[in-house]
Amino acid sequence: MIEFLLLMLAVFFVWKIFDQNVAETRIAVILPESGDKRWDALINGMKQSAAENNAHMIICNTEEIDGPEVEREFIREQKDNDIDGFIIYPAPGHETENMLKKECGNNPYLLIADSLAVKEGETASPTIQPDYREIGRRLGEQLKTKKQKIGIIADWKMSEAVQAEISGLTEALEGSGSEISWCIYRRKEQNITERMKEETKADALVILDPGVLEEFGEQAEHGKYKGAELYGVGYSLKTVALLDKGNIQGLVVPDGYEIGYKSVKEIAEKIEHKFYKMKGYTTEYQIFSKKDFSMDDDLERFLYSYE
């Protein structure tokens, strides 16, 4: 009996030794402007999932990624570092999908936060992202309560996500008397305020670029912006605070934490089990309106998805 117990203990300790020495899965994460605070919740979700899935994340240090050529260089660099798989925010451009398939090769990759345009009959890469059309529609529902002229400021690249948001916004405004007067697509190093002077006066701005929304909200907070009411998509706690102060009137917050968590879980599963078919997911988002916002009640709801 004692010999049997000693044998079982020996087996247990050997198992623990080998279990602790299992190599971590190495996952490269490629995001545009990777140090930007809009990725905070997403990266928090990734870190939590990585800890649960024995994965090590390498977040590439990037600036703006304005096309597939730039993204290709980051992929090649990480392949030289013996990466097992990639999580990628796809660069704008019709050639991105083909580039990813070619460059990633046998390394699995998963797209996040923005899908790629796919021709009829082709199969898209799995993507984890919110329903951008529905986000646009919900913003439109906040705006259609009164007749007004609306201006749109979108990300500097005309992504599939932005197109879907604008489509949803347009659908929601149909028959309301409100209309979209103009749309500006941000360009690199462009002064948006100066660019807006070329357009007709708007009663409300829908800002689909989180960085620009926060910038305009901060200007309103300090009395430097006194134009149209601000609505848009944001990720940061600062943006929610600006809503609470009345500098922003309507806000949609995608659940970046969920995107990050599920993306690592899926890619880790694929790396461990070669024949596993990765799934795409439609993730959650929060909707806030200044007129019924409560910092006590709604902040907790935001923080739940943020952290």
Q: Each PLM stretch: what is its role?
A:
Residues F86-G105, L169, Y185-V240:
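Hydrophobic alpha-helical
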Residues K262-E307:
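Hinge/cleft segment of the Venus flytrap/periplasmic-binding protein
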Residues P126-G151, Y235, T239, D255-E272:
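Hydrophobic alpha-helical segments within soluble ligand-binding/sensing domains
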Residues M1-V14:
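Hydrophobic membrane-insertion alpha-helices, especially the h-region
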Residues D114-E120, P210-G211, H222-L251, F288-D292:
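Venus flytrap/periplasmic-binding-protein-like
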Residues R38-N53, I135-L139, E160-E179, E215:
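Short, solvent-exposed amphipathic alpha-helices that sit
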Residues I17-L42, I59, P126, K149-M158:
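Short beta-strand segments enriched in small/hydrophobic residues
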Residues E95-E134, S236-D244:
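Flexible loop/hinge segments that line or gate small-molecule binding clefts
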